[in-house]
Amino acid sequence: MVHLASIVSDLGFWPTVAGTVATYLFYQIVATVYDVYFGPMSNIPGPKLWAASHIPYILMLWNGEDASTKLALHEKYGPVVRVSPTELSYREAQAWKDIYGHQTRGKKSFPKDSRFYAPAVNGAPSILNADDPTHTRHRRILAHAFSDKALKEQEPLLKKWSDMLVSKLKENVEKSPSTPLDLVSWFNFTTFDIMADLTFAEPLYMLEGSTYSPWVRTIFGSLKLGSRLRAVRILPGMTTFINMIMPNSMRQKQVEHFKYSADRVDKRLANKNLDRPDLWAQVLKRVDVDGMSMSVAEMHSNSAIFMLAGTETTATLLSGLTYHLLQNPATMSKLVNEVRSTFPTRDDINVETLQRLPYLNACLEEGMRMYPPVATGLPRLTPKGGAAICGTWIPEDVAVSVSQWSTYQCEENFHKAKLFIPERWMGEDEQFANDNHAAFQPFSTGPRNCIGRNLAYHEARLLLCEVLWNFDLTLDEKSEDWLNQPVFTVWEKDPLWVRLQVASR
């Protein structure tokens, strides 16, 4: 009798389970159909499959196809595209203001999407991922380290490293004149040594050794993995799941990597009276002034951010710009002539004069438009209650961003958008009179725009000028298709092989 009751009970259990699962699936299908065709974002253009499921978007990010796919989607669907059930991509100038700009008249700011901005290993906020009040405090303290006055004081340090770059390049050219050099690596060596000198008061000695340090190799190795983990975290509940299954060895590597920079900050802080114009010299002057403060843990978090955001991006700008100049000989010749005619000797090169070179600055802008160091969108979340973006109301908790690559390649924003033409930035050619410069924000905009913008410009001008003043460049055939690159938050760059010849005087 008991056995029979058990059988009956079992037969009743499984139909119940099947019915529950079927009901759940039916509900999900109905909810998805409603959301895609009748929900508050059903009027936003985009592929229906992407609006119904996160999977296509996650696969796009996983494969490094963010820039190319979003460009294709925008060209098909227009200025705003629904790229997942809970994410929108924009390419309009107004979207920069609505999403990232200063919010007035009681409007709420758009918080950063925590799935994209991972917390530091020590849990302390940095200027990149802090909430608004903490970000304001950090920025007020750090702003002095990136001011024009501070950058002027840092010029000898920048010149020291630009001199070493030229010296090392000449050394290689003299050793093997016909061998092409990978300028991606050389620009990385230089920008990392500069930022380490500014952040830790000691370089990484990559230029001196002409090779990547193990620490920097770890940084580059983590970019792809980090981008893919961010993609997976888009799925609800995956952040907790990833934390559960992450091997202890990987956690230990994260800790060791963070400790490397933290130890060097501690070493610099132990020498508070060190007389040099680095970042922490400026910060230490501001801490506890006017009630402002920054904990040592926060300094550790910020130093880790500086060592990526202030290095790889500048090297990317220089690499991409060099490639485009080499693919456009007339433009290269015009820029080289401006540089060499302005500075009769190398000693004449200085950051103040470089700021005033019109064609050099136009080339930098065009380089960032054609090859933005951060090609993806930087996602924010619509605030509680929702918000209007480009005149359309978007519900709360939707990830929104401006896709830089799509925006800069859009003919509605820039005439002949897919061509490298620095003259568009000089205001002299009528065919570019309607270019929408407000759509161009390579350093973002608003209260959380890139604090290192001035340093990046000074550094890029100086390093490019030094290379062009000292060398004649020719693109090696191995790098003809160099631009064909995946994106994992930043471009995954192949070597840029360039033949250098010391310029004759």
From Swiss-Prot:
Membrane topology per record: Single-pass membrane protein
Residues that bind heme: C450
Keyword Metal-binding among record annotations: yes
Coiled-coil ranges from the UniProt annotation: none
GO biological process, one term: terpenoid biosynthetic process
The UniProt record lists the keyword Ion transport: no
Pfam family, any one: p450
Any one cellular-component term (Gene Ontology): membrane
Protein name: Cytochrome P450 monooxygenase efuB
Organism: Hormonema carpetanum
